[in-house]
Amino acid sequence: MNMRAVTLIAALCTTATWAPARAQTVETSVVKFPQDIVYKGLPGAPQHVTLYGDSSQPGLYVDRIRFLPGMKVMPHWHPDTVRTVLVMSGTFYFAVGEQWDESKLVAYPAGTLYSEPPRTPHYAWAKDGEVILQITAIGPTGNVAVAPKKP
């Protein structure tokens, strides 16, 4: 077999493997305009909206979380295998640990991207005003509260 034939066969095989990925991307396209994003949540709790996927199921999902000014999130963790967080607006104060310790909080301004390793306890505060986060992760997810240590 000459080199030209080998190259042609390799190109056809490669192109054939791309077709399902392209088709799948088109079938799962999602568009969310700002006016279509409606946050929901209980009073006193962070508000939530799912932009893509289903965080209760295995697979990729994208959520936005809105924290009202002054809202504190006590130590907890998530089971996601991969979890990245983008601070979209506001300044988010974040720390890793099982106990609330204000001195360990680090200010993450808008535009900051960070990751949360699986099952790593952390806590946060929307100290200076409203904060909006965008979470991109592999589900299923959940919030597991960390019980405070007794003195």
Where would I find each of the regions flagged by the language model?
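A short, N-terminal "cap"/entry segment at the start of jelly-roll beta-barrel domains
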Residues: 21-61, 148-151
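Conserved short histidine dyad/triad with adjacent acidic residue
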Residues: 61-79, 117-118
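Glycine- and acidic-residue-biased ligand/ion/polar-headgroup-sensing regions
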Residues: 68-71, 78-99
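Double-stranded beta-helix
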Residues: 28-30, 103, 123-151
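Short beta-strand His + acidic residue motifs that chelate non-heme Fe in jelly-roll/DSBH
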Residues: 73-75, 94-95, 116, 121-127
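Short acidic-glycine-tyrosine-enriched beta hairpin
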Residues: 98-118
